[in-house]
């Protein structure tokens, strides 16, 4: 089962991915982690990516997509994978789709978690990250996942706050990219939605991200 996740920052996308990872024993692959791994290992692609990152530039697709494909072809992905954080625009979606097909790798399910921008922003400003696992849900504004004081509600680990999670301008910038249906991340999601509508094996699932973590997870599992 190969699954691609879409959702704005604050939608709980990472949390839902972590739940599916545990339930189905699938690797949860985040594009940022792929960059960090390649750079730390000193791979040829990692070295090229680092040059762009150090300049503050976006890493081009001809570097990013081969990295992602290499990760998806590793042994732990043979029974399936969850990909999160890529693609971020329609061109990347088209390129990823063509690359997977060329590699004889099927994309089975695309999940889009929908959430109002204002709700998403409030969630971001209230979230706290566990030093042991960023996907442990802790949010000072949501009763169901409020942390245990200054400790993670899941494992008791130390909590930290990302500086850009408290920067409204930075949050708005991220959301502007995501919610743009012409050139942004939603344009990538809708590319796959349109593919699924044409028939074939690809399934496109939309979820309301407003309810609690357990409710969203239950709906997601029921639709898979």
From Swiss-Prot:
ATP binds at residues 10-15, 127, 211. It is an enzyme of class 2 (transferase). It catalyses: AMP + ATP = 2 ADP. InterPro entries: Adenyl_kin_sub, Adenylat/UMP-CMP_kin, Adenylat_kinase_CS, P-loop_NTPase. Keywords: ATP-binding, Cytoplasm, Kinase, Nucleotide biosynthesis, Nucleotide-binding, Transferase. Residues 126-165 are annotated as: LID. Catalyzes the reversible transfer of the terminal phosphate group between ATP and AMP. Plays an important role in cellular energy homeostasis and in adenine nucleotide metabolism. GO terms for cellular component: cytoplasm. It is found in: Cytoplasm. Monomer. This is Adenylate kinase. The gene is adk. GO terms for molecular function: adenylate kinase activity; ATP binding. Consists of three domains, a large central CORE domain and two small peripheral domains, NMPbind and LID, which undergo movements during catalysis. The LID domain closes over the site of phosphoryl transfer upon ATP binding. Assembling and dissambling the active center during each catalytic cycle provides an effective means to prevent ATP hydrolysis. Pfam families: ADK. The keyword RNA-binding does not apply. It comes from the Bacteria. NCBIfam families: adk, PRK14529.1. GO terms for biological process: AMP salvage. Belongs to the adenylate kinase family. Coiled coil: none annotated. Its EC number is 2.7.4.3. Residues 30-59 are annotated as: NMP. Its main location: cytoplasm. Pathway: Purine metabolism; AMP biosynthesis via salvage pathway; AMP from ADP: step 1/1.
């Amino acid at each position: 089962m190969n699954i691609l996740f879409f959702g704005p920052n604050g939608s709980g996308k990472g949390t839902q991915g972590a739940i599916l990872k545990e339930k189905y024993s699938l690797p949860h692959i985040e594009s940022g982690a792929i960059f960090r791994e390649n750079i730390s290992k000193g791979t040829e692609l990692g070295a090229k990516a680092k040059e762009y990152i150090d300049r503050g530039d976006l890493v081009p697709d001809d570097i990013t997509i081969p990295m992602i494909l290499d990760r998806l072809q590793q042994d732990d992905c043979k029974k399936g994978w969850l990909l999160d954080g890529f693609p971020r625009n329609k061109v990347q979606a088209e390129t990823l789709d063509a690359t997977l097909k060329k590699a004889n790798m099927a994309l089975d399910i695309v999940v889009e978690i929908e959430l109002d921008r204002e709700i998403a922003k409030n969630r971001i400003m209230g979230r706290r990250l566990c030093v042991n696992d960023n996907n442990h849900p802790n949010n000072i504004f949501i009763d169901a996942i409020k942390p245990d004081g200054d400790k993670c509600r899941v494992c008791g680990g130390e909590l930290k706050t990302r500086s850009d999670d408290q920067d409204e301008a930075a949050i708005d910038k991220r959301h502007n990219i995501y919610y743009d249906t012409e050139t942004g991340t939603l344009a990538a999601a809708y590319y796959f939605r349109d593919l699924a509508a044409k028939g074939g094996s690809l399934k496109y699932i939309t979820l309301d991200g407003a309810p609690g973590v357990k409710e969203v997870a239950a709906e997601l599992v029921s639709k898979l």
